[in-house]
């Protein structure tokens, strides 16, 4: 029986994902599978290529013929070179970048929220009303200080008068 290593399309529309499978050469693309070797997700950056190296080399050694795209993937992972005894059998697939855990993202957002908003979102009317309220509060504070100063002056003047009257007696 002629056996091929093919890509079997799975996934949604416009989101291609493939399984790297071993099938009978005459089987249709979505047909019966002898063995599933791995996955290929080209939509991710960088692409995800995860192929079981040991099983891929076994099937190549037994005589399974890869399709052109499957051959390109097997060359990237180095499985084709290892099975055929060629040089350059190292895996050249770029590793996926480390994702932040949800706990780290949550803690960063919590720390940012604790610092408070970085900019105020205030309309023009509210800004003017806020400035007027601050000016009014400042004017009231000044009036209160003047009243206290005048009361202190009166108290000092009365104390001076009492001391003069006491010394005159």
Curated annotation (Swiss-Prot):
Entry's Gene Ontology BP terms:
translation
Start-end of Acidic residues biased regions: 159-169
Kindly indicate whether the keyword Ribosomal protein belongs to this entry.
yes
Q: Name one GO molecular function term.
A: structural constituent of ribosome
Q: Which GO terms describe its cellular component?
A: cytoplasm; small ribosomal subunit
The alphabetized UniProt keywords are: Ribonucleoprotein, Ribosomal protein
Q: Where is the composition biased (Basic and acidic residues)?
A: 129-156
**SUPFAM superfamilies hit by this protein:** Ribosomal protein S16
Q: Which Pfam families match?
A: Ribosomal_S16
**Superkingdom of origin:** Bacteria
**InterPro entries linked:** Ribosomal_bS16, Ribosomal_bS16_dom_sf
Q: Does the keyword Ribonucleoprotein apply?
A: yes
* Residue ranges, annotated region (Disordered): 114-169
Q: Which family does it belong to?
A: Belongs to the bacterial ribosomal protein bS16 family.
Name this polypeptide is given: Small ribosomal subunit protein bS16
The species is Corynebacterium urealyticum (strain ATCC 43042 / DSM 7109)
């Amino acid at each position: 029986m002629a056996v091929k290593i093919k890509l079997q399309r799975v996934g949604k529309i416009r989101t291609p994902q493939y399984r790297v499978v071993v099938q009978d050469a005459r089987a249709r693309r979505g047909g019966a599978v002898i063995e599933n070797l791995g996955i290929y997700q080209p939509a991710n950056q960088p692409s995800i290529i995860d192929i079981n190296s040991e099983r891929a080399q076994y099937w190549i050694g037994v005589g399974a013929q890869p399709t052109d795209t499957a051959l390109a993937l097997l060359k990237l992972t180095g499985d084709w070179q290892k099975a055929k005894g060629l040089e350059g059998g190292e895996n050249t697939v770029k590793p996926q970048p480390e994702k932040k855990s949800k706990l780290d993202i949550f803690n960063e957002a919590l720390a940012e929220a604790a610092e408070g908003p970085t900019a105020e979102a205030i309309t023009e009317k509210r800004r003017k009303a806020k400035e007027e309220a601050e000016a009014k509060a400042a004017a009231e504070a000044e009036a209160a200080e003047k009243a206290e100063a005048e009361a202190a002056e009166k108290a000092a003047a009365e104390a001076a008068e009492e001391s003069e009257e006491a010394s005159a007696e």
